[in-house]
Swiss-Prot record:
InterPro entries: Depp_CoAkinase, P-loop_NTPase
Protein name from the UniProt record: Dephospho-CoA kinase
Tagged with keyword Lipid metabolism: no
Binding site for ATP: 19-24
Species for this entry: Synechococcus sp. (strain CC9605)
EC number: 2.7.1.24
Entries under HAMAP family matching the protein: Dephospho_CoA_kinase
Length: 207
């Protein structure tokens, strides 16, 4: 939890490495009735056709990232650029992160009277968004599992998958920054009892 005034609202920051299982935990939290604000969704919307950020990306990369016969961005082509060039990744993050932060502020205002909300943010620590959260849950798995899951999920080569993992802070660095670590090393859904106990906790317990 970031230092400062205590929140009147429980704000669960849900993060973890790529392919660690954040989305599964996020879907489960939504099934428990919590609004889930999704940074990835906000980022996708920011790069929709006609948006200012989309125009900036098109101006920088041109037809290389333009989906055939449309004004949309070919996200796979953009990924091949930014996950293999740290300077280009930083440029894109500097473009998108302020937009995502603004969308979170807007969404949190809409949910101001909701007792608890979830902020699902893959790059929570990298983007410095800890101050939005009253507590942070890290969905954790072994690095080897992370690689295997990413290759299977996205059909990537091992090299391409490693590049995407390397673009984020390592899980062992994030473990020490989270308030709670949700273990996702076992079979699918093995994390649910732990998540259920965390959800039942007082928002201020152990923080």
């Amino acid at each position: 939890m970031a230092p400062g005034e205590p929140f009147s609202q429980r704000r669960i920051g849900l993060t973890g490495g790529i392919a660690s299982g954040k989305s599964s935990v996020g879907r489960w939290l939504a099934q428990q009735g919590l609004p889930v604000l999704d940074a990835d969704q906000f980022a996708r919307e920011a790069l929709a056709p006609g948006h200012p950020a989309t125009n900036s990306v098109m101006q920088r990369y041109g037809s290389t990232v333009r989906a055939e016969a449309t004004e949309a961005i070919d996200r796979a082509a953009l990924g091949r650029i930014v996950f293999h060039d740290p300077a280009e990744r930083r440029w894109l993050e500097h473009l998108i992160h302020p937009i995502v932060r603004e969308r979170f502020d807007q969404a949190l205002s809409l949910h101001a009277d909701t007792p608890a909300v979830v902020l699902m943010i893959p790059l929570l620590f990298e983007a410095g968004l800890e101050s939005l959260c009253s507590e942070i849950w890290l969905v954790d798995c072994d690095e080897s599992q992370q690689l295997e899951r990413l290759i299977a999920r996205d059909g990537l080569s091992p090299k391409a998958a490693q590049a995407r993992i390397a673009a984020q802070w390592p899980l062992n660095q994030k473990r020490g920054l989270a308030d709670h670590v949700v273990a996702n090393q076992g079979h699918p859904g093995a994390w649910q009892p732990q998540a259920r106990e965390l959800l039942k906790m007082s928002p201020t317990a152990e923080l």
